[in-house]
Design a protein with these regions (language model features):
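Hydrophobic alpha-helical transmembrane segments of membrane proteins
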Residues: 1-75, 93-224
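Short helix-to-coil transition segments within interhelical loops
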Residues: 82-87
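Alpha-helix N-cap/helix-start motif at helix boundaries, enriched for small hydrophobics
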Residues: 89-91
């Protein structure tokens, strides 16, 4: 703890919380390697960049929020309380930590994808990559955007069951266009306007994260 505290001098409150989250999750780093294994497997099977990105977003949404479980299991509230930051900075720092997990995973996935493309001497389509990133960010934001306020309000143990709901919601949204013909036009639009659809996904994701953050702050303030 003293080692970590010394390394965080001069940082902003948000950066301190983000750094502390990474410090605590360092022991879980090996579990993230399973994402690389999954992406390699899917890549060898010839999966598209969209499938790879969405798989990564799903995985990170599942793994990154484990910080709440570790904090609760190891009674680390006192450690977080010792950091001189505001409640808003605690929440924003946690959101930043989770987002950086997603961002890093997307960088790794794109590098692996480009590696597959080069090995096969194929060509890659930038709009396809943009569409994959846009959809993956929407999946990630929808899941974590619902989960995070619940964890801040109820704690990991009490919210664990409720945290499954966003995964079910995302699965429903993914399969719904296949069964509802009226929604199939969305898929057609996405394929014919990849850049525009990707931008719409990113914009929607940012709105979800913004609203989620403010709800989480309200919930966390009431808990304190």
């Amino acid at each position: 703890y003293l080692h970590w505290q010394g390394r965080c001098k001069g940082m902003t409150g948000v950066a301190r919380i983000t750094k502390l989250d990474f410090f605590i999750m360092k022991s879980q780093g090996i579990s993230y390697l399973s994402l690389v294994a999954v992406i390699l497997l899917f890549g060898l099977m010839g999966s598209s960049i969209t499938v790879l990105c969405i798989t990564g977003a799903w995985f990170i949404a599942l793994m990154a929020t484990n910080i709440f479980a570790i904090q609760e299991k190891n009674h680390l509230d006192r450690l977080y309380g010792s950091v001189c930051v505001s409640l808003n900075e605690v929440v924003l720092g946690r959101y930043t930590f989770v987002f950086l997990n997603y961002f890093t995973s997307m960088v790794v996935i794109i590098i692996l994808y480009l590696g597959f493309v080069l090995c096969r001497k194929a060509t890659f389509d930038v709009p396809d990559i943009m569409l994959g990133l846009g959809l993956s960010f929407l999946v990630f934001s929808t899941i974590t955007g619902i989960q995070m306020p619940l964890f801040f309000k109820m704690g990991y143990t009490k919210a664990k069951l409720w945290s499954v709901i966003p995964f079910a919601v995302v699965m429903l949204l993914v399969v719904l266009p296949s069964f509802v013909s009226a929604l199939s036009g969305i898929l057609d639009f996405a394929q014919s306007h990849k850049e525009l659809f990707a931008f719409a996904c990113i914009l929607t994701s940012c709105i979800i994260q913004f609203v989620s953050y403010h709800i989480a702050v309200i919930f966390y303030r009431k808990q304190r």
